Regions:
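Transmembrane alpha-helices and adjacent helix-loop boundaries
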Residues: 1-243
């Protein structure tokens, strides 16, 4: 997955720097991107971006500054109360009305922003629950060592909270990866969109229905099961409290 993302990113920089002639990778418009690779790109990028944003929102919600706390609470509660499909329609249609005339904002970038916002709100609540589960003595230990707030969070609190929240974060990541199939409703042909659209519309695939969706289900199961197994391995590696 990471190799594919790296190839896609580096290929864009290379083609933009030296042109499209005699290059192995050429720039692809977002409307032309599709298939299972689109699901992998959206899932990997959005989970990677939503984790630090979710940590910031969780800390902001517990902040003593009223403005920061209010902004984080409103953002989390609003995003959690809106279906993801609504945010995707906003990314596809509504955002264009707020951009200056003649401005082109790539569709896949708009979708990444909306999905990241959606998943970060859920990750923030998972991390907030982990922070609340920590004993009060951990905070007092940080104070007794003379650590300020950033040092206490970076060295003592967040490492323990993130270890506790691994199952919840993985649950959000798996759900987010499966929700990337919703981009088909805004005319982005991911794996499911390709099956429901051009593949089933082709006469060459007449009578073939369950096999296509069965293959798609197997692909998604392999990725989600791999994520689950990795999280269990990570939990065992980080279970230092019983050693």
């Amino acid at each position: 997955i990471f190799a594919a993302i790296l190839s896609w990113t580096v290929g864009g920089f290379v083609t933009g720097a030296i042109g499209t002639e005699n290059t192995l990778l050429s720039a692809v418009p977002s409307r032309d991107m599709g298939g299972f690779m689109l699901n992998l790109i959206l899932g990997t990028v959005c989970v990677s971006l939503s984790l630090p944003l979710g940590i910031a929102l969780a800390l902001g919600r517990q902040s003593d500054m009223p403005i920061i706390k209010w902004i984080c609470v409103v953002f989390i509660e609003f995003v959690r109360g809106v279906p993801l499909i609504t945010l995707l329609f906003v990314a596809n249609v509504v955002l264009a009305y707020f951009l200056p005339p003649g401005t082109t904002f790539d569709l896949i970038l708009r979708v990444i922003i909306m999905i990241t916002m959606f998943s970060s709100a859920y990750i923030a609540e998972v991390i907030r629950g982990a922070l609340a589960a920590l004993p009060r003595g951990q905070y007092e230990a940080a104070d007794s060592l003379g650590l300020d707030y950033p040092q206490a969070m970076r060295l003592i609190i967040l490492p323990q909270a993130l270890k506790i929240s691994i199952p919840g974060i993985v649950n959000v990541a798996v759900g987010l990866f499966k929700d990337t199939t919703l981009v088909s409703v805004i005319s982005m042909f991911d794996l499911v969109g390709m099956i429901r659209g051009p593949i089933l519309a082709s006469t060459e695939w007449n009578g073939v229905y369950w096999e296509l969706f069965g293959a798609a289900a197997i692909l998604f199961f392999v990725v989600c099961y791999g994520i689950s197994q990795y999280s269990q391995w990570l939990e065992r590696e980080l279970a230092t409290d019983h050693r």
